Amino acid sequence: MAKIRETVADIDNCVFDFGGFSAHGVLNIIKESNWVIIPCLPDFNSLLRTAETIKEIKEINKNIIILATDYKDQNELEFLITNLTENFKEFKVIYFRNSKIFKNAINFGKSFDELINENAISQNGYKNFAKEYHRLLEILKTTQGE
């Protein structure tokens, strides 16, 4: 069973989610990580927070992936593409459309792949999400960063 500790341990093949908050040891974890994934929602405030976070950590670890997430329509996607491409050319960007897969993963205790592969309907319904999700996994698996 996992335990909450005062400091964060360095664990291989692990994803840390700090929920937007700094915890003791975060910078050490970032320094030792192959990749740092920074989420960005389709609004100006989130874009500013993303910029602040990148500014704070890019000298510690430049292997940053921006996860542009929760966009609901073409206008929000275009907002993300325009602003992220214009301001963060040197980083990889993955786009996750707003999807029920997040809620379903939590509610049913299943992984994204388990939900995607449940049946033909879910494969079709999650098709676009699956494409970007697997693209993210390939980046994480096939490259160790720079």
Language model regions located:
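Short, well-ordered alpha-helix to beta-strand connector turns
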Residues: I11, S33-N34, N61
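Conserved nucleotide-binding/hydrolysis micro-motifs of P-loop NTPases
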Residues: Y71-Q74, I101-F102
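Conserved C-terminal guanine-recognition region of P-loop GTPase G domains, centered on the G4
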Residues: L47-T69
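Inter-motif core of Ras-like GTPase G domains
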Residues: F21-F44
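Structural beta-sheet core signal
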Residues: F16, I38, I65-A68
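Switch II (G3) loop of P-loop NTPases
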Residues: T7-V26
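Beta-strand-loop-alpha "switch" segments that mediate conformational coupling across diverse proteins
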Residues: I81-I116
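Inter-lobe coupling/hinge region of RecA-like P-loop helicase motors
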Residues: N104-H134
